[in-house]
Structures are given as C-alpha cells and as structure tokens.
C-alpha cells in the first residue's frame, strides 16, 4: 500500500503565499499599516523562545509585523494581565499569543481568558472554545485547526468515519475531538485511564496522537488502511505514534517532523490575517 504523505511543510508554504496576497489587500485598506501578531513570552525557556522566533519569522514572510513581548521569570499574574490589557487596547495588534507554559506562579487560565476573543487567534480562551463547541464562529486552537486544514487539503474523508483522539488537553485533544465531530466523524477520546486502549485504536479509521509521550501508540494497534495523524514531537525526531511500523500499511500519515508542526504556525498566521480582515472590513 502506498500511503499519502500529509505534507504539512509543503502545504504551509502554499498557505503562506495565499496569506501574502491577503495581507497586501489589508495594507491597501489601512494606509500601508501591516497587521501585528503580538507574542508574549514569560521567562527564558529556550524551546519557547525558539517557537516565538519561528512565529515572528512566519509573520514577516507574509508581510505582517511581529511584536515580541518578553517578561521576566518573576512576573506576576497581575502584571501579565496588565500587559494583555494593553495589547487588547492596541488597535494595531490583531492577534495575541501567550506562549505556553508560563511560570508556575502565574494563573495561566486567567491570563488566557483575558485575551479579547477578537484577538484570540491561538484559540485558547474558554469563551472561544465554548463558541466553537456550540458551532458559533471562533478561532480554533491552532494545532487541531491546522490538522483539520491539512485533512481537508488532502481530501481525507471524515464524514461517518470513526476517529480516535488519544489525549484530552484543553488546547489539543479536546478541541481536536470537537472539530472532528463538527465534520461529522464519530469521535472517541482516549486518555491515561482508558481501558483496552489498543482495542479502541484498532477500530479507528482516523487516529490522532496528541498525548505527548514518544511512540506511545504502537504500530500494531493501528489497522491497515487507517489515517494516522501524529501531533507529537520529541527528541530524536519521533512523535507520539510508532510511525515506522505503519507507513507501509496506512492510507495516509503526517510525517514527524514536517507534518503537524508547520500547520500550527501557518494556521496561527491565517487566523491573524482573518482577524485583520474583519477589522479592516474586508
């Protein structure tokens, strides 16, 4: 069986080209002012700093501006909330991203929820998640929304399919399940206390690995002809799924790296562009 490679890197590059054109139209209506994506990094975690740089580079590639806000490790919840309020009030800023995780003394949920829903381009607020769950307009959490874009691009059938999401985090597993449900898939969410996990996964037409444990999902748990989406990334270039054991048997799969990761950033940029278009009346 020759599997379809769900190439997120290639599709993200295509999306960036489309975003460039849309940003040009926005700037034509705003006297040349580019939309701004503001990213907030609290502390100096090297991985988080790398992600922030990658997002800034993506902004510049499509003609947007990136505002990088770095706060000290000892920042309090109140100080971070004040900074978010400042960015909410700045009409030049069309998207706000608070880099996860924040230091333990900060109430992360309160800070996420302080972001204006119109600028919640990373889909992290409870208001936005609730609207999405009720089929109302909202920006989706960037990683699952990126996965959905990738599946649609490659015309992977979802309606009536049995989908299993392994992981239930509020920014990945849960919104992923809601998006698949909205696409008329029949969805099962699995987690650390799921009984007979291999048997549940063997039923799946579509498997999404979203639990953050390297190669936790074994190849022999996955049936022939399944669509395999791996949202994990760990040292050594492996994800949450033992991909090497299924590439020859599955219908389609996301490579690690180069599958889900590039789509997360591309979706964040696309949702910021959409927010800027709404603000510009386009």
From Swiss-Prot:
Superkingdom, taxonomy of origin: Bacteria
EC id: 1.5.1.5, 3.5.4.9
Annotated positions binding NADP(+): 167-169, 192
Gene3D superfamilies: Leucine Dehydrogenase, chain A, domain 1 (3.40.50.10860), NAD(P)-binding Rossmann-like Domain (3.40.50.720)
GO terms under cellular component: cytosol
Keyword Ligase: no
Metabolic or biological pathway, per its Swiss-Prot or TrEMBL entry: One-carbon metabolism; tetrahydrofolate interconversion
An example Gene Ontology molecular-function term: methenyltetrahydrofolate cyclohydrolase activity
UniProt-listed CDD domains: NAD_bind_m-THF_DH_Cyclohyd (cd01080)
Family the UniProt entry places it in: Belongs to the tetrahydrofolate dehydrogenase/cyclohydrolase family.
Self-association state and partner proteins as the record states: Homodimer.
Function of the protein: Catalyzes the oxidation of 5,10-methylenetetrahydrofolate to 5,10-methenyltetrahydrofolate and then the hydrolysis of 5,10-methenyltetrahydrofolate to 10-formyltetrahydrofolate.
Name of the featured protein: Bifunctional protein FolD
Source species: Acidobacterium capsulatum (strain ATCC 51196 / DSM 11244 / BCRC 80197 / JCM 7670 / NBRC 15755 / NCIMB 13165 / 161)
């Amino acid at each position: 069986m020759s599997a379809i490679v769900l190439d997120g890197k290639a599709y993200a590059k295509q999306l960036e080209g489309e975003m460039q054109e849309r940003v040009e139209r926005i700037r034509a209506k705003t006297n040349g002012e580019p939309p701004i994506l503001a990213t907030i990094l609290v502390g100096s975690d090297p991985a988080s700093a790398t992600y922030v740089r990658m997002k800034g580079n993506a902004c510049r590639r499509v003609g947007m501006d990136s505002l990088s806000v770095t706060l000290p490790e000892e920042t309090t919840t109140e100080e971070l909330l004040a900074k978010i309020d400042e960015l909410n009030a700045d009409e030049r800023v069309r998207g706000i991203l608070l880099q996860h995780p924040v230091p333990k003394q900060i109430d992360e949920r309160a800070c996420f929820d302080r972001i204006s829903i119109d600028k919640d381009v990373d889909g992290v607020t409870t208001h936005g998640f609730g609207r999405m769950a009720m089929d109302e307009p909202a920006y989706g959490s960037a990683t699952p929304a990126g996965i959905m874009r990738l599946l649609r691009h490659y015309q992977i059938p979802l309606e009536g399919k049995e989908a299993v999401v392994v992981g239930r985090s509020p920014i990945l597993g849960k919104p992923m399940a809601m998006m698949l449900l909205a696409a008329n898939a029949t969805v099962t969410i699995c987690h650390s206390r799921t009984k007979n996990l291999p048997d549940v996964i063997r039923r799946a037409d579509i498997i999404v690995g979203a639990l953050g444990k390297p190669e936790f999902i074994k190849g022999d748990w996955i049936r022939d002809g399944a669509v395999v989406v791996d949202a994990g990334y760990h040292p050594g270039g492996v994800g949450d799924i033992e991909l090497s054991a299924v590439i020859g048997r599955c219908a389609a799969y996301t490579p690690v790296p180069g599958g889900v990761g590039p789509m997360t950033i591309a979706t964040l940029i696309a949702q910021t562009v959409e927010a800027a278009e709404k603000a510009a009346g386009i």
